[in-house]
From Swiss-Prot:
Protein name, per record: dITP/XTP pyrophosphatase
Role of this protein: Pyrophosphatase that catalyzes the hydrolysis of nucleoside triphosphates to their monophosphate derivatives, with a high preference for the non-canonical purine nucleotides XTP (xanthosine triphosphate), dITP (deoxyinosine triphosphate) and ITP. Seems to function as a house-cleaning enzyme that removes non-canonical purine nucleotides from the nucleotide pool, thus preventing their incorporation into DNA/RNA and avoiding chromosomal lesions.
Record-linked Pfam families: Ham1p_like
Metal-binding is among the record's keywords: yes
UniProt-annotated catalytic positions: 77 (proton acceptor)
CC per GO annotation: cytosol
GO biological process, one term: purine nucleoside triphosphate catabolic process
Transmembrane annotation, as ranges: none
Keyword NADP belongs to the record: no
SUPFAM superfamilies found in the cross-reference section: ITPase-like
Cofactor(s) it depends on: Mg(2+)
UniProt cofactor note: Binds 1 Mg(2+) ion per subunit.
Length: 203
């Protein structure tokens, strides 16, 4: 079995145009990387997500950014998996928000579809985060993290982004969007994925 490739250097492109996500990733990697140019800052195009899995889409985005920038790049593909909706919105979580990235509308769609499903699995859900670290030569290291919880409506809290206001992680009474950001970083699906990535490529 080939040993994982280690990151070496002080600059890592964050292959995202989502400012909230870029900020969260930079916070999680601040002890290991000095510079975090984003895909938006480098004016890199957003590749179409054509893969069928979170890891597939993360790898696609990371490779595209690494090739375009000539630097190592990290991409995240994350989403909300609702048990009663057979995993939807899943890899289409961002698309449910539309081109305007209206997650208020996306959360309302989840609520409506959950109501219509009337499934015995109820409001159980999980957030999934796949991380892919790519180099300009095309090599990719990838991991996947999860956080289990329940959905709540109406949305609560203003500290998060995406579907954070409707997701209550197991063991908590608050939504992701009501939690202190440092606490959310410690328990989130992204934190789970980052713990794996740090052990694999940065330790």
């Amino acid at each position: 079995m080939t040993a994982p490739r280690r990151f070496a250097g002080d600059t890592l492109v964050i292959a995202s145009h989502n400012r909230g996500k870029v900020r969260e990733i930079a916070d999680l990697l601040a002890a290991h990387v000095r510079h975090f140019p984003s895909a938006a800052e480098l004016d890199l195009p957003e590749p179409e997500e054509t893969e069928a899995t979170f890891i597939g889409n993360a790898a696609l985005k990371a490779r595209a950014a690494a090739l375009a920038s000539g630097l190592p790049a990290l991409a995240d593909d994350s989403g909300l998996w609702v048990d009663a909706l057979d995993g939807a919105p899943g890899i289409y979580s961002a698309r449910w928000a539309g081109p305007e990235k209206d997650f208020g509308a996306a959360m309302e769609r989840v609520r409506r579809e959950l109501e219509a499903a009337a499934d015995r699995r109820g409001d159980r859900a999980r957030f999934v985060c796949a991380l892919a670290l790519a180099w300009p030569d095309g090599h990719v290291e990838a991991v996947e993290g999860t956080a289990h919880g329940t959905l709540t409506f109406p949305p609560r809290g203003g500290k998060g982004f995406g579907y954070d206001p409707v997701f209550i992680p197991d063991g908590h009474a608050c939504t992701y969007a009501e939690l202190d950001p440092a606490h959310k970083h410690a328990i989130s699906h992204r934190a789970d994925a980052f713990r794996q990535l740090l052990a694999r490529c940065f330790a």
